[in-house]
């Protein structure tokens, strides 16, 4: 069963639309090879922090995808979704 996996990233300088598109393509390709699927991202208003949500077998699969893509990250962890 797939887990919810969260990735935290910090950008300095702030993330541009061009860079977002470039890294998104790299991560999609590498994540797909590990049965991980990007679901959504939350980018801070100043474009310096982003949290991405994946459905994946485990957090390690997503870490490996980011490392293979050469995209830095601050942290990757499995999470539980709580909503109203």
Question: What name fits each language-model region?
Answer:
Residues 55-84:
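An amphipathic, aromatic/His-enriched active-site/gating alpha helix that lines ligand/cofactor pockets
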């Amino acid at each position: 069963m797939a887990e919810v996996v969260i990735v935290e990233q910090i950008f300095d300088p702030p993330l541009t639309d061009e860079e977002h598109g470039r890294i998104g393509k790299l991560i999609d390709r590498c994540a797909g090879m590990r049965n991980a699927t990007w679901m959504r991202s939350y980018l801070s208003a100043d474009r310096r922090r982003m949290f991405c949500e994946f459905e994946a077998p485990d957090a390690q699969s997503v870490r490996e995808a980011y490392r293979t893509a050469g995209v830095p990250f601050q942290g990757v962890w499995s999470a539980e979704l709580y909503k109203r």
